[in-house]
């Protein structure tokens, strides 16, 4: 589906203060790795993740989301009262209810007329949020939409390490928990508006999505534990991505290896990125990587990577950028953006 008048007005991000290296995790897991005869460099070689960041223990995610949202509003050059839609796409939540969006809405002091709600779809949530907010903007619901996402992985990683250190842990337990050890934390926010109101050149051109919910149980997580069949998830995700690429090629303008300047994909790790590149026949050199220093930050990964790429000057005005996400479920979304 194509957008006709949708712009990205601003992006802001916040990185947690605590950096935790893969080497630190490996040291804590050394007895487990020795027992299963797993090389100590296996985690780094398989994931390509050097470090990830965690918030200080107990830091509320709605406060992290509020802080970064406030900066996104300021960068957009608008007043908080102009925000008509607020969507939180966080996997991490401080409470089952109220919604994260309502907490951020209250913290920011937004108007009573501002629609606010949570939208969750695993690691695909932020891209889904852009689509939903974009449709609402183009239908006239509001002039400005604010998307927020605050992710915290410290507690689940810590709980996973504690479980793996138990002498009763099996090799299967280790590999089912392996993906959890790649998780990181971050907060990100984005302001969307009508192209006719925008002060930027950043346009969302359109997006396509496909689902394969026969594979919805390959990654199942709670606040304390995540169990993942990484091999099957990778294979099924790549197959669905190939199908989605075909749909995108037919429905989105300039959607081809030749027409796309940069790929900003969901950031899982090195083996996943390489498999995706090979399956789609795209250039690895065009892929912007954030996982080496941030790990997998869930739905915050794509907007964070986009923000880092624009901040560094890698993505420049006028560049055609492909935003691509794969979320547990399985769901895949591919989105065309002209920066």
What are these regions (language model features)?
Residues 9-12, 120, 145-151, 192, ...:
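Short beta-strand segments
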Residues 20, 97-99, 131, 156-161, ...:
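Short acidic, glycine/serine/threonine-rich loops at helix termini
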Residues 36-42, 95-110, 156-169, 216-218, ...:
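Acidic-glycine-rich active-site phosphate/pyrophosphate-binding loop
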Residues 62, 66-69, 92-93, 105-106, ...:
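Claisen-condensing/thiolase-fold acyl-transfer catalytic domains that form or cleave C-C bonds
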């Amino acid at each position: 589906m194509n957008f006709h008048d949708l712009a990205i007005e601003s992006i802001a991000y916040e990185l947690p203060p605590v950096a935790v290296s893969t080497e630190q995790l490996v040291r804590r897991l050394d007895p487990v790795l020795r027992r299963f005869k797993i090389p100590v460099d296996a985690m780094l070689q398989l994931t390509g993740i050097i470090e990830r960041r965690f918030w200080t223990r107990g830091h509320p995610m709605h406060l992290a989301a509020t802080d970064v949202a406030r900066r996104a509003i300021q960068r957009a050059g608008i007043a908080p009262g102009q925000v008509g839609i607020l969507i939180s796409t966080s996997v991490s939540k401080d409470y089952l209810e109220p919604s994260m969006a309502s907490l951020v809405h209250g913290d920011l002091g937004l108007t009573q007329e501002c629609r606010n709600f949570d939208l969750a779809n695993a690691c695909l949530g932020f891209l889904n949020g852009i689509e939903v907010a974009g449709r609402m903007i183009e239908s006239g619901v509001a002039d400005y939409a604010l998307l927020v996402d605050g992710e915290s992985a410290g507690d689940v990683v810590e709980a996973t390490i504690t479980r793996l250190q138990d002498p009763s842990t099996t090799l299967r337990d280790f590999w089912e928990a392996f993906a959890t050890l790649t998780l990181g934390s971050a907060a990100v926010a984005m302001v969307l508006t009508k192209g006719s109101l925008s002060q930027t050149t950043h346009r969302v051109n359109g997006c396509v999505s496909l689902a394969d919910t026969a594979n919805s149980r390959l990654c199942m997580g709670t606040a304390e534990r995540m169990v993942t069949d990484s091999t099957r998830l990778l294979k099924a995700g790549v197959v669905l991505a190939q199908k989605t690429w075909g749909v995108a090629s037919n429905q989105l303008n300039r959607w081809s290896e030749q027409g796309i300047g940069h790929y900003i994909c969901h950031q899982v790790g090195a083996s996943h990125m390489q498999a995706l590149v090979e399956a789609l026949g795209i250039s690895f050199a065009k892929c912007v990587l954030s996982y080496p220093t941030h790990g997998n930050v869930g739905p915050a990964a794509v907007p964070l990577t986009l923000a880092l790429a624009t901040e560094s000057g890698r993505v420049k005005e006028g560049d055609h950028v492909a935003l691509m996400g794969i979320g547990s479920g399985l769901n895949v979304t591919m989105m065309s953006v002209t920066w």
